[in-house]
């Protein structure tokens, strides 16, 4: 399934990272109990899907591998939040769609994108239009593959956090002896 998708679209796997549970757990305290959450870059074995369901949320998940492209598809069922980890290569398109949908959202992206001119310009325009960016910044560079992470990934949010910037403490960075991989990797080989 995933292998075919990458081949058909001439993509490389470096754009596909599976979020560890450690990062999913950080956002849960900011969500209203029993809410419905759309995870648009996820499969049934995604840590977002599994851990949000375990925490009592109803989860709608979709993935481009299944023909449900976030940029062109939206679930018919109503949802309260959009939460996921989108592909880095389409970050600006994802952010544009998220603000257009006008739903509270939280997506994981690297903090360095704030330095990208196109992203900075986009956030400035959103601010001028009354749309506020919020950040949930974790205090460690979290590893997605067990190796040392090269930059900090945090949540970019809108209409979700009680304050525009919140810092969160993590007990470890999910590398080496603390590494726990995402169960979504199971879906890659299917």
What kind of feature is each model-predicted range?
Residues 1-190:
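Class I S-adenosyl-L-methionine-dependent methyltransferase catalytic core
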């Amino acid at each position: 399934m995933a292998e075919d998708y990458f081949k058909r679209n001439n993509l490389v796997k470096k754009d596909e990272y599976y979020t560890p549970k450690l990062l999913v757990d950080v956002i849960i305290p900011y969500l209203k109990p029993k809410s419905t959450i759309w995870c648009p870059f996820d499969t049934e074995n995604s840590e977002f899907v599994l851990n949000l369901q375990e925490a009592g949320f109803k989860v709608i998940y979709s993935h481009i591998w299944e023909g449900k492209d976030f940029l062109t598809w939206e679930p018919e069922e109503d949802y309260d939040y959009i939460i996921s980890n989108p592909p880095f290569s389409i970050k600006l398109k994802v952010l544009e769609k998220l603000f257009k949908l006008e739903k509270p959202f939280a997506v994981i992206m690297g903090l360095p994108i704030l330095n990208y001119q196109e992203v900075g310009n986009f956030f400035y325009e959103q601010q001028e239009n009354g749309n506020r960016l919020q950040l949930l910044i974790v205090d460690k560079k979290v590893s997605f593959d067990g190796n040392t992470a090269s930059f900090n990934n945090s949540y970019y949010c809108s209409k979700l956090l009680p304050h525009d910037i919140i810092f969160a403490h993590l007990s470890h960075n999910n590398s080496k002896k603390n590494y726990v991989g995402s169960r979504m990797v199971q879906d890659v080989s299917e």
